[in-house]
């Protein structure tokens, strides 16, 4: 079977999307119930956040069994129903591959703690506190990446939380297990993997073989994927400099795609300053071996908005605009808010952000709920603030659950982002809603392959205007996106008759386009 092209990915937290059995948790069958909605929206792939058995302390990333599904979500039969139903609608299922660490409750680690020498080799230990310069991912929650384990009588390394010990991928049996986990899920029909914490995986592989700085591990993973389905997407989480993207991709011999943290940072700097030139600057900083269609773009994800790739003054500019209160910030580097509250609930501004994102020539990710402007809950700890249930309608439980009294995390009813105001059902029936604008953009992008190509950045008459040209004459298209609050106007540099693909807050008169603040337009030369 040919690999399905990545056109648009929809990220789902299975615990928070749709409860099909009234127990208060999302389920895999609940996701299956909503596949028609995703097909209507224009989605080609679903990215499932972790659904494995886990210790319940880190959103499913603290895995206790890589082969079993959390029984609260369903079982293998439910997973197969989801895969088959999605495939029937032309949608592929991408799953998380979390093999840089496990939960401390994982049987492998428990055996290691108890002194089994074979399992001890699977993790990283030290008799003393190492002075290795490694910094924890979650300061000040974690003061160090090494924690004393009294039962094991040694320090244990964890790049993430203390209860998520690092696997030692320098140890051959661990690498063999990684490939076995991949094969297990490939044989059950998954359409790709999102690989968690890639730089830390290759860092340990380098200790077994320094060749290519440990990146050979990704080639072994590519070979395993290709043995089941050649060209299968391997999407890497690697928050590295853009100039290093090509090393992780290696023209498809390693990962197929990378999550583009670099441009995501520049994108939010542009939103904060109302200056589209920050996007253009970010687009110009890639190496020659990371074309746009190998990069994954998003607005917000399951975690904090991590701004580490910006300079300190740039980071502070984004913080001041979108996280002015201390409780909105986290880890000294990020923002724990969803997009809609960051942009003040402004539908035009949110839609403009989507128009810009979908103009980058990258593979876009829609996080569940972002298409309707789902809110956050700053009362929840850490990154949980952005992990709220989906709103399907304005009735009790918001359609997330039919038993709201049993809801694990209750959706808010009132306020600007409550389900009585923000929900799918209402927006599907409301002309010019955020949902219908996002759908229009996705559908037009799917219908016009020229918009999926890597664009050429043009010099605009105003720094607020992002001006991107796609394709070659006579089959060309143009994206015009106004990041600023004030109107701008521009001559359209396309030849031949013009056709409007998408237009909001924009007016075309002859060959001149007038854009209001946060207005946008996609134009095409006839035939594009």
Regions found by a protein language model. Give the residues of each.
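Active-site and adjacent substrate-binding regions of carbohydrate-active enzymes
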Residues: 1-496, 502-528
């Amino acid at each position: 079977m040919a690999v399905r092209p990545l056109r648009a990915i929809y990220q789902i937290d299975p615990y928070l999307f749709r409860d099909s059995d009234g127990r208060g948790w999302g389920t895999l069958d609940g996701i299956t119930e909503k596949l028609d909605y995703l097909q209507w929206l224009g989605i080609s792939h679903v990215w499932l956040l972790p659904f494995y058995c886990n210790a319940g302390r880190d959103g499913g990333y603290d895995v206790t069994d890589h082969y079993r599904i959390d029984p609260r979500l369903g079982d293998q039969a439910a997973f197969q129903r989801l895969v088959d139903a999605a495939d029937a609608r032309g949608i592929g299922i991408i799953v998380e591959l979390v093999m840089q660490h496990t939960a401390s409750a994982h049987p492998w680690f428990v055996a290691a703690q108890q002194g089994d020498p074979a399992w001890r080799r699977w993790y990283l230990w030290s008799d003393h506190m190492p002075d290795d310069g490694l910094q924890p991912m979650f300061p000040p929650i974690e003061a160090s990446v090494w924690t004393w384990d009294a039962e094991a009588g040694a320090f244990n390394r964890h790049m993430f939380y203390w209860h998520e010990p690092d696997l030692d991928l320098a140890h051959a049996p661990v690498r063999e297990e990684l490939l076995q986990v991949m094969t297990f899920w490939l044989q059950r029909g998954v359409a790709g993997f999102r690989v968690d914490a890639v730089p830390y995986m290759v860092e340990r592989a380098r200790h077994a073989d320094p060749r290519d700085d440990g990146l050979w591990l990704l080639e072994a993973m590519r070979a395993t994927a290709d043995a089941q389905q050649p060209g299968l997407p391997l999407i890497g989480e690697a928050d590295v400099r853009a100039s290093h993207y090509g090393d992780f991709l290696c023209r498809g011999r390693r990962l197929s795609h990378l999550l583009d943290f670099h441009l995501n940072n520049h994108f939010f700097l542009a939103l904060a300053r109302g200056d589209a030139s920050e996007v253009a600057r970010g687009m110009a900083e890639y190496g020659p071996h990371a074309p746009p269609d190998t990069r994954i773009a998003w607005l917000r994800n399951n975690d904090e908005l991590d701004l580490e790739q910006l300079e300190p003054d740039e980071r502070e500019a984004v913080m001041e605009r979108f996280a002015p209160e201390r409780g909105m910030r986290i880890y000294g580097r990020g923002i724990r808010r969803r997009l809609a509250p960051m942009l003040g609930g402004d539908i035009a501004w949110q839609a403009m952000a989507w128009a810009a994102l979908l103009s980058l020539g990258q593979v876009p990710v829609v996080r569940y709920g972002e298409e309707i402007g789902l809110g956050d809950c700053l009362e929840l700890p850490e990154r949980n603030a952005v992990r709220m249930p989906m709103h399907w309608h304005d009735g009790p439980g918001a359609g997330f659950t039919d038993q709201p009294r049993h809801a694990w995390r209750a959706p808010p009813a009132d306020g600007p982002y409550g389900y009585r105001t923000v929900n799918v059902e209402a927006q599907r029936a409301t002309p010019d809603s955020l949902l219908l604008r996002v759908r229009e953009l996705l559908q037009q992008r799917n219908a016009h392959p020229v918009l999926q190509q890597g664009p050429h950045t043009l010099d605009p008459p105003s720094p607020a205007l992002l001006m991107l040209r796609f394709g070659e004459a006579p089959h060309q298209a143009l994206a015009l996106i106004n990041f600023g609050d004030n109107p701008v106007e521009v001559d359209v540099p396309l030849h031949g008759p013009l056709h409007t693909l998408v237009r909001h807050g924009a007016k075309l008169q002859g060959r001149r386009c007038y854009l209001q603040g946060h207005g946008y337009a996609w134009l095409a030369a006839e035939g594009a």
